[in-house]
């Protein structure tokens, strides 16, 4: 058995080596960047190098107090149900996904700010190209949006998307402040202080991303697997800009090196472990004031991405459409919306912007439901979908019933618009709980009826799931297979995981 395992382990390593060599060859061919496992270790690093070569001339990295100030303005994708309430609704519902949201945001950006950041107090300088500012919100009058514009960090450090923002002090960037002003009837605020740039923009980021998207589209049409490199680089391109400070590092020492290292670094040592081979692993603190990144660029991209989604999420409420309230859930770049509301939204968009909302171009929307990853009920068991795609009769999948418990916790009951009577598939998510754990719970206690399980979750019932097959790495490097019980409950204040 050991020889068998060794043989397949060696074969896996050979296959990985061949794949890496092919990836490296294509990276050199298309980008003249060598992912050589020395200077560049990851796709994010490769993408960042490409942006550095093309888009960051005359711009500066930031560090220290400026970096931490800008970081406090940085908020990830908006993920919530409408008004943060649980939802169970029967209707024709679409899951519309925006193509390449973050690359779209980079194309829409004015560029990367040139020059060094400068300090301001009390008044935002009119000559500012871009700024990050701390404000106190004095007065807000406008629609009570299902998907609020601003997230306020609560006592647990979780972003709470709320319309109740009067009296709050927040740090935001130019785009978010403009959105707060534009999407409300009245918005009054007091400026405290901030940082700004006033030397214009390096505008190459838009053309660089657009070239990558168009090149990927061409390769994809030709069936060239190199299109995946372009996809990876575009999706990873913003993350490396906001790399968090690395505040500690592991040092591995042979026995003869230990005493000298401890004597010279005793004030920075956090933890010491002896490894199975006799070496010593020392966790050592690193100074974070030497960490530089492009946090302001990462925050600008995230702000622009949410701005693009707001133009879809908020417009029907803003114009007081009778179909407002038919967007039920959003997760960063996608929305669950009723079919009739989507048709109206397309019309509103076309009249306002003169472009098509749905399509295959960068930034347009497309339906994201597909059969892969779905489940069916068979013999009172929830099993992976086994029906042939022909049973859809050429129709498109949509959700005929939606259950939303909270963030990243929902169930879609899918069917085909050409064969409603014979097709019923299930697509679900439950953050913090593996698919296998949900399926086991469903089959053991609900006879495969996953709708009944989600009804209990929406009702606020506490539910215990057993997570199995997990790997835990010990401080000494040993790896063990473990299982864990996790209790889930959804309340008015959000999900509780124990």
Stretches found by the model and what they are:
Residues 1-498:
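Conserved acidic
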């Amino acid at each position: 058995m050991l020889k068998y395992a060794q043989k397949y382990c060696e074969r896996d390593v050979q296959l990985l080596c061949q794949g890496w060599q092919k990836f490296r060859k294509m990276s050199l061919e298309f980008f003249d960047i060598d992912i050589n496992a020395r200077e560049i270790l990851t796709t994010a690093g490769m993408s960042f190098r490409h942006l550095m070569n093309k888009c960051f001339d005359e711009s500066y990295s930031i560090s220290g107090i400026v970096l931490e100030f800008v970081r406090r303005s940085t908020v990830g994708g908006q993920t919530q149900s409408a008004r943060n309430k649980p939802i169970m609704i029967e209707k024709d519902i679409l899951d519309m996904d925006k193509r390449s949201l973050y690359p779209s945001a980079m194309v829409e950006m004015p560029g990367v700010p040139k020059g060094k950041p400068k300090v301001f107090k009390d008044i935002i300088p009119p000559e500012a190209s871009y700024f990050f500012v701390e404000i106190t919100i004095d007065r807000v009058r406008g629609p009570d949006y299902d998907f609020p514009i601003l997230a306020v960090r609560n006592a647990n450090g979780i972003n709470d998307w709320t319309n109740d923002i009067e009296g709050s002090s927040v740090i935001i960037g130019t785009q978010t402040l403009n959105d707060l002003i534009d999407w409300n009837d009245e918005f009054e605020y007091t400026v405290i202080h901030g940082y700004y740039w006033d030397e214009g923009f390096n505008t190459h980021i838009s053309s660089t991303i657009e070239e990558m998207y168009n090149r990927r589209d061409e390769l994809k049409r030709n069936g060239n697997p190199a299109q995946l490199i372009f996809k990876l680089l575009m999706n990873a391109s913003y993350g490396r800009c906001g790399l968090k400070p690395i505040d500690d590092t592991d040092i591995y020492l042979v026995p003869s090196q230990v005493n000298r290292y401890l004597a010279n670094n005793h004030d920075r040592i956090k933890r010491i472990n002896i490894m199975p081979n006799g070496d010593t692993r020392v966790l050592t603190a690193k100074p974070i004031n030497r960490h530089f990144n492009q946090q302001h660029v990462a925050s600008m991209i995230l702000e622009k991405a949410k701005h693009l989604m707001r133009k879809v999420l908020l417009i029907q409420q803003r114009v007081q459409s009778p179909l407002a309230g038919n967007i039920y859930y959003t997760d960063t770049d996608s929305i669950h919306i009723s079919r009739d509301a989507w048709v109206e939204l397309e019309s509103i968009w076309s009249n306002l912007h003169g472009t098509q909302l749905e399509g295959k171009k960068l930034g347009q929307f497309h339906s994201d439901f597909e059969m892969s990853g779905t489940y069916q009920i068979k013999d009172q068991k929830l099993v992976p979908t086994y029906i042939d795609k022909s049973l859809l009769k050429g129709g498109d999948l949509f959700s005929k019933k939606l259950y939303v418990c909270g963030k990243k916790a929902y169930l879609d009951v899918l069917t085909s618009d050409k064969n409603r009577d014979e097709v019923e598939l299930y697509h679900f998510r439950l953050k913090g709980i593996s698919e296998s754990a949900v399926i086991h719970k469903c089959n053991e206690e609900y006879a495969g009826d996953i709708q009944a399980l989600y009804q209990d979750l929406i009702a606020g019932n506490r539910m215990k799931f057993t997570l199995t097959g997990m790997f835990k790495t010990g401080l000494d490097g040993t790896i063990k297979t473990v299982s864990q019980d996790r209790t889930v409950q959804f309340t008015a204040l959000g999900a509780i995981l124990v």
